[in-house]
């Protein structure tokens, strides 16, 4: 029996209880949201790991991508990245490996972290053949089953990419066409074989596998726009419509889902994308990479992604995939992972400040920082800071004899007003 089945029957499972406790809300609220598909708790029945709630009333969660490429194969380094991601605050890790022994990398990551682990099975299916288009539908489904058997908690499947998507793409004026790796594999396969996407055509079989292992489906955004000029076009929204239909079928099969999107999007179109996704997908949890709000920032795309993520959070995003400074340039290093996670944590916190559910706890953190700043309590500020070590290093590098910072010293506004109020009270 899956977690969603239990929730529909009114059962508050240990996973639901754990999420409720972590989020500080009533377990019945969590159960109801899981039953309706508004919250997902990605946890494979074969894996004993920390339950993490994603969706309505939940604090905003963060995923970190790790994994080899065919040009950079260092398995130990990727394991260390996964561990570092968990240590730096990621709530989930995805193994996107395409080079080396994919089974070894995946099993080692599953053992190395105590948070949900996701994968993209089509990468392994493609690796089993010399050419991507030569993989069979059996290769695709066998890869999904293998990952499920090994304990993977959620898998990205680009089931919304189908022959209809292909036709929309042909009729579009896109500059970047398709930038999703899994989406490009799928489109190339359909064109070569003259058949529809097996993950779409045989979606019921995919649901059978997911249900057997209580594995969550992350419905991938294979048609996401890869540049600002392509944002909010027909291929993108056509996929959202299809994904919404697949969300409904998944819920009927008692399989948990969340939905990925929406690519590169200018600030003024983020609300349209996110609200559109939420509406078309019946409130399913949304999992976004970014969105990236400009195309001219290689080396700084962790910042463009955090800006987009924060704005998207105002309109319903639940799960942010961190972007690193290496995006569009290279495989990320551990330092890139840390930097990407920190700016994404900032974006997530700004979302939580206004999100129903985590809002009260987030406000307490900011209020505590306000009091610490008012009191010039530096140790408390470092304790509350999102990266206290960095804050301490900056202050220590340019210290002043004043108890204020070296920017203002004795001219510190907080210090002046504090002393002025103190003198007034003494006179009174």
UniProtKB/Swiss-Prot annotation:
Protein name (database record): Phosphomethylpyrimidine synthase 1
Cofactor: [4Fe-4S] cluster
Family: Belongs to the ThiC family.
Annotated HAMAP family: ThiC
Residues annotated for substrate binding in this entry: 65, 94, 123, 158, 180-182, 221-224, 260, 287
Species of the source: Methanosarcina mazei (strain ATCC BAA-159 / DSM 3647 / Goe1 / Go1 / JCM 11833 / OCM 88) (Methanosarcina frisia)
Residues that bind [4Fe-4S] cluster: 405, 408, 412
UniProt keyword Transmembrane, yes or no: no
InterPro entries: ThiC, ThiC/Bza_core_dom, ThiC/BzaA/B
Co-factor: note: Binds 1 [4Fe-4S] cluster per subunit. The cluster is coordinated with 3 cysteines and an exchangeable S-adenosyl-L-methionine.
